[in-house]
Every structure is written in C-alpha cells, then in structure tokens.
Amino acid sequence: MSETFGVDSLITDTADRLFSQICDHESVQNAELNGEATEIWNAFAETGFPWISIDEKFGGSGGTLLDALEVLRLVGYHAAPIPAAETGVLGGWLLASSGQQLPEGVVTVLPSGSEDLLVTRNGDHLTLTGRGLRVPWARAAEIIVVPIQVEEQTFAATVDPDDCQITPMTNMAGEPRDTVDFNQVEAFAAPLPSDVNLQTFRFRGALSRTALMAGAIEKMSQLSVSYTNDRVQFGRPVAKFQAVQQHLVWGAQDAALARMAAETAGREANRGDGAFEIASAKLIANQAAARATKACHQAHGAMGMTQEYPLHHLSRRLWSWRKEYGGDAEWGAWLGRVAVSQGADGLYPLITGGSAVLK
C-alpha cells in the first residue's frame, strides 16, 4: 500500500499487518451474523489505535489527525467491523476537547447531536428526552457522547448507556446502528471551546466517513483487478476483454480520486479548518463510491454477489457510509452556497485556495 505524506509509516504498517491478521472474510462475516466483533476490537484496542490523535493527558495515544485518518482508511480497506471513528476521531475528540478523560472501552456519539432531543439544563448537568437514530455501536458503548448546543454554548454531554433504552438495529452492511431512547436521562455536560461546535462536529464526521470510503474503494478496485486476471473465459483472463477493462479503469480512477480527496481534506483539517476541502471530499467520495461499486460488481459478475466472496462487505459499507454525515444533496448545496457567496470574481480563488480564502 502506498505511503501517505505526513503520516507515521510505523503506525500505518502496523495497522495494516494487524488487520490482515484479524480481519479475514470469515471474521467479518461472523461479526455481521453475531452483531459484535469483540476479538477484533480487543486486538485493535490493545495497540492504542482507537485513541490516536487524542492527547495522552486525556487518555489518548498521541499522534496527529492525519495518523488517525490513515488508520480509518485501513479500517475501510479491510472492512473492519469496529467503532474506530466513533471512539477516537469523533467521540474521543469531543471528550478531550471538553477536558474529559477517555474511558478504556468503546465510545459512540449521536450523529445528529441533540437535534431530536428535548434538553433541559441544571448547572453542569442536562436532562435529555427523545430518540437518537442510527447510533453506531450504542449497544457496545461504555459512554455515549452527545454534542449539544444550549443557548450560545456547545457542550459535550456524556450519557451512561445503561440509563437509556437501546434497540439493536443495523445498517446495510450489518454494522450496529442502534436506536437510543432517552427518557429524562441525566447527562454530565462539559463546555467545549468556541471552535468546537455542532457544525465542526458535522464536518469531522464527514471527514471520518470519507477516509473509510477511500479505503474501501481502493480494496474493491484491487479485488476486481485480481479476480479478473485470475478468471479465465474463452481461453484468456477476462481482464483482457475491453469491456471488462473499462470497468477496471473506472474502479481504479475512483479509488485514486477518493483517496486524493480524503488526504487533501485531512491535511487541511489537521491545520485547523478545511471546511471547503472536507465538503468537497465527502461529495467526491460519495459519488466515487456509487460509480466504483457499480463498476466493480460488473467486473465480478455473479461472483461479486455471493456471500462467500468478500466484495459485498465493501460495497454494502460504501452504500451505508455515503449516507452518513451528509449525502450528495447536503454537501452539494453547502458548496453551492459558499461559491455563490464569493461572487463571480471569487470563484476561481475559491477553487484554487479552498478554505484559506474563506477565513
């Protein structure tokens, strides 16, 4: 796998080797059937990978956001059925940003924040009533983090899952996306700094899914090349047929496009902003996922639809992730509003300068 600029190669090489050992097709399949992947998570957690990019004084593993995003790319590449993004890049980030210590176990977050909750405040405690939908791995979480805005202040509210009613649900890939009901649940609320709010949380969620999708598209493209070179039809590998080659090219170019977009957005976010690049990258990855899954399934034919072959673990994750933290319509509309706000003379500087122009 190619090296990413600005990322510690020791981290990525170790993560890649680990996933190669613990995330084979059978393990991923069993995780979907059983609704949990305890052994995979435990092996992942023992290395400290979930908490990369979180300062050690809060219980993190140190490192940069770029390191964490590269690990997420590998999670997507290997279709690892674990809450890596929620525990570190999202939930862990909210906890550390509000000065709270990270727990040793799984952390999850409400993707929609407090949007669907009735919130009442009493000092540094909040009472939450309502329902959170499609909460990743809520059933396995030690803490549920809810980003909440009360008046002009944004808080990271922490909830004990035992105080909630959790209904197990899954996404298209069989990953836990549970329903969490809050019935006057007490939550501790720690204030977040001004640069961490519901909007920046939304962007960071989109960035996490972009990294995951970039990895999955890359692996899907590689599987397609390998399979079509091995599969012989009419006396030669099917990869020699022009129609199949066209599908392989589409898969490869979308893999390169998604990874380039994810890395660009990650670098800008690591510098402290990157809103324009993240929105662009999520839209690019969403569209690349749609094209690549079609092309790669076409290249595989019937084999790609079987349970025994791993392609579906990737394509079903892509179909699920592309809807999380903003679909095409949301990010396309956001980019359109930003472009219009810059006026005709500001369009080219926006394209070439990105978020730096918006400051």
Residues covered by each model-derived region:
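Active-site nucleophile and cofactor-binding loops and adjacent substrate-binding regions
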Residues: 34, 61-62, 82-88, 110-111
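Alpha-helical interface subdomain recognition
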Residues: 1-77, 203-359
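Hydrophobic alpha-helical segments that drive targeting, anchoring, or assembly
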Residues: 71-72, 80-93
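FAD-binding core of flavoproteins
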Residues: 82-83, 93, 98-218, 222, ...
